[in-house]
């Protein structure tokens, strides 16, 4: 049985070399006339048809696009891997700085610490003597004025109550246990400080110091930091621990004498 010749085109090395040279020279999609000229020229080196030339250029362009696509994908993957490595290397280095920034206290001269008038805080301490250990928003201001401002004494000292001379040491100690150690703060103040203290001096001194700190003149600072009428009232200290006897013995003796007189009658 005779074998039919194959219709598949098998290009010779000379034909492939000529086609590749033409492709490198810039020929990508030849028209019909160019295909006929190329086919006639390549027919000297072997069997070839016009459709073989057309499909060779089409397949060669497709292979080149695939190669370019693979190169671009490999380049993008390499760049992405490098970016990931840089991000992972920079994350541990920046985490201590961020934690230190979060835990760092605000600067002493920064605007984050509110400036509260010491006289207003004195009035707050007078009405809330046991809230000082929980909220102290004016620590930054007091830290700056510690060298010039006289420390605010306890509300009991503002009323010039002489606890040591009044014979109420035992009663103050007992009340200190009930009020969370308040008597310990009272006993820490010396008797000389209690006697020298004047209730009007802290107000004037605070106005002068705050006026100087704000950079204004004496008159401008006093006018700017003038307190309302409720804060200019003199402080009053409640008589929590009475210093005088209640006269129970006299009342008992008088009641006994009256009962005896009624019984004799």
Swiss-Prot record:
Keywords from the named record: Developmental protein, DNA-binding, Homeobox, Nucleus, Transcription, Transcription regulation
Cited Pfam families: Homeodomain
InterPro entries, sorted: HD (IPR001356), Homeodomain-like_sf (IPR009057), WUSCHEL-like (IPR044555)
CDD domains: homeodomain
Region (Disordered): 77-107, 242-265
Gene3D superfamilies: Homeodomain-like (1.10.10.60)
Biased composition (Low complexity): 254-265
PROSITE patterns recorded: HOMEOBOX_2
Tissue and organ expression note: Predominantly expressed in tissues enriched for shoot meristems and young lateral organ primordia. First expressed in lateral domains of shoot meristems. It is then expressed in the margins of young lateral organ primordia. Not expressed in roots, seedling leaves or fully expanded coleoptiles. Also expressed in vegetative shoot apices (five leaf primordia and the SAM) and in the male inflorescence. Expressed at high level in the female inflorescence.
Cell compartments where the protein resides: Nucleus
DNA-binding region(s), chain positions: 4-68
GO molecular function, one term: DNA-binding transcription factor activity
GO CC terms: nucleus
One GO term (biological process): plant organ development
Location, primary (coarse class): nucleus
Function: Probable transcription factor required to initiate organ founder cells in a lateral domain of shoot meristems. Involved in leaf formation.
Family that this chain belongs to: Belongs to the WUS homeobox family.
Record protein name field: WUSCHEL-related homeobox 3B
Species this chain originates from: Zea mays
